[in-house]
Amino acid sequence: MRKIITIGREFGSRGRELGRRLSEDLGFAYYDQEIISEIAKRTSMSEQYVQSIVESKPSFSFPIHVSSSFYQMSDPMYDHAMAVYQKQTLIIEEMAARSNCIIVGRCADYILRDRHPLRIFVYADMESKLRRCREKAPEDEKLTDKELRQKILDIDKIRAKYYEFYTGEPWGNKLNFDMCLNTTNVSIKELAAAVAKLYES
């Protein structure tokens, strides 16, 4: 059985950075945006369109885990969303079978639940997330603190809706994770080293 770590994260909490550091420390493959690229290759959709689907709040009334019988009507957006999620599931399962790996986001903790991955959720306080977003923002982005705070909240709300729609589980629920890490004022390099040491012990 391959060793797998999944990372869910709040926007701006440096979950991606932690994932990359862990992959270097453990020698594991790292998957994030690579999943989007692979979905695009296997469908007729562009990467930008696939990205827009996975970053959009589902507009359907019932979560997908309830029953597909609710969606007998023809709805192109629904069909595309389902096609993307099905490809995403297949690709994540293939990646997990191929080698030891770290997968960020994409409902990977749920998709791979039968493989018993180490499930990590990363969070931080709002001030820390604001600082991180400022550091990573394009030079031409001129958001006030209030606007940026709202952007962070909106992105996390979309992530929660997406996760809950496809899994039927609440996003970020600590009971669904093996490790919840607060990255506020923490060195990601040191945190990754500590997690890697704990994981290998």
Regions from the PLM with identified roles:
Residues 6-20:
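Glycine-rich phosphate-binding P-loop
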Residues 29-40:
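Short beta-strand-centered segment that lines the nucleotide-binding/catalytic pocket of NTP-utilizing
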Residues 40-100:
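ATP-dependent small-molecule kinase phosphotransfer cores
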Residues 60-65, 142-188:
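Small-molecule kinase domains that catalyze NTP-dependent phosphoryl transfer to phosphate-bearing small molecules
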Residues 89, 188-196:
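Short, amphipathic alpha-helical "lid/cap" segments that border enzyme active or binding sites
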Residues 105-109:
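Short, polar loop motifs at secondary-structure junctions
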Residues 114-135, 143-153:
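Conserved phosphate-donor/acceptor-positioning beta-strand/loop module used by diverse small-molecule
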